[in-house]
Amino acid sequence: MNHLPEDMENALTGSQSSHASLRNIHSINPTQLMARIESYEGREKKGISDVRRTFCLFVTFDLLFVTLLWIIELNVNGGIENTLEKEVMQYDYYSSYFDIFLLAVFRFKVLILAYAVCRLRHWWAIALTTAVTSAFLLAKVILSKLFSQGAFGYVLPIISFILAWIETWFLDFKVLPQEAEEENRLLIVQDASERAALIPGGLSDGQFYSPPESEAGSEEAEEKQDSEKPLLEL
């Protein structure tokens, strides 16, 4: 009879430990998971990631910077109107800078269309623009007479070449890997939320019932009453 309270204590301890284990299982908060999923989905609905927007801004900067240098070159070589007519209307591959400006326009249109409008997740568009830019500039530097026209004969081809390769590096090493990493994180969070949904809901303290402890003498009294019942019936 003296071992009964110890058994009751062991039972209570077991129930408390099971309760603690259930709480540990529900340490994953589905609300937090859903909040993270909504944040990732909000980025998708936003249409364009922050790093891709930065890339598009740099492409725009490429066009504006080359345009600015070309306008400066037009103004330096005898006025904008006269030089513009000479380079555009009387275009000469060997001495004109107009084709370098058109090359910047070509990069801008292709890259913005591919990575801002179509939201392409492949490198083929940037590979096309960089290859065309590199081949054209190398041919122009070798065949043309730009170096005899002052500093702009060096500046415009070099700047265009560098900007094209910076765009390639930025897309290939920043934009595409970061977006792929964010997509993998979204898949992991969604998978964790699905697993958390399969776990049964946590049990509250009120759902655990612990029977009241009985005194040692109460069972002895019950046994005496059971033994006296046949005598009373006789």
Curated annotation (Swiss-Prot):
Name the predominant localization: membrane
Give the Phosphoserine positions (modified residues).
15, 21, 27, 193
Pfam families, per the entry: MENTAL
Q: Where are the transmembrane segments?
A: 54-74, 98-118, 123-143, 151-171
Keyword set for this entry? Acetylation, Endosome, Membrane, Phosphoprotein, Transmembrane, Transmembrane helix
- Positions on the Extracellular side per record topology: 75-97, 144-150
Keyword Nucleus annotated: no
The UniProt regions of compositional bias labelled Basic and acidic residues, in chain numbering, are 224-234
Enumerate the Gene Ontology biological process terms. cholesterol transport; vesicle tethering to endoplasmic reticulum
What is one cellular component GO term in this UniProt entry?
A: cytosol
Q: Which GO terms describe its molecular function?
A: cholesterol binding; protein homodimerization activity
Its membrane topology is listed as:
Multi-pass membrane protein
Hey, which stretches end up on the Cytoplasmic side? 1-53, 119-122, 172-234
Per the database record, which ranges form the MENTAL domain?
A: 48-218
The entry's localization annotation reads: Late endosome membrane
- N-acetylmethionine occurs at which residues? 1
Motif extent (FFAT): 208-213
Region Disordered: start-end pairs:
200-234
Q: What does this protein do?
A: Tethering protein that creates contact site between the endoplasmic reticulum and late endosomes: localizes to late endosome membranes and contacts the endoplasmic reticulum via interaction with VAPA and VAPB.
The subunit field of the Swiss-Prot or TrEMBL record says: Homodimer. Interacts (via the MENTAL domain) with STARD3NL. Interacts (via FFAT motif) with VAPA. Interacts (via FFAT motif) with VAPB. Interacts (via FFAT motif) with MOSPD2 (via MSP domain).
Which PANTHER family would you find in this protein's record? STARD3 N-TERMINAL-LIKE PROTEIN, STEROIDOGENIC ACUTE REGULATORY PROTEIN-LIKE
Concerning its family, UniProt says: Belongs to the STARD3 family.
What's the record's remark on domains? The FFAT motif mediates interaction with VAPA, VAPB and MOSPD2.
What this protein is called in its record is STARD3 N-terminal-like protein
Organism per entry: Homo sapiens (Human)
- List the lineage, top down: Eukaryota, Metazoa, Chordata, Craniata, Vertebrata
Give the gene name. Answer: STARD3NL
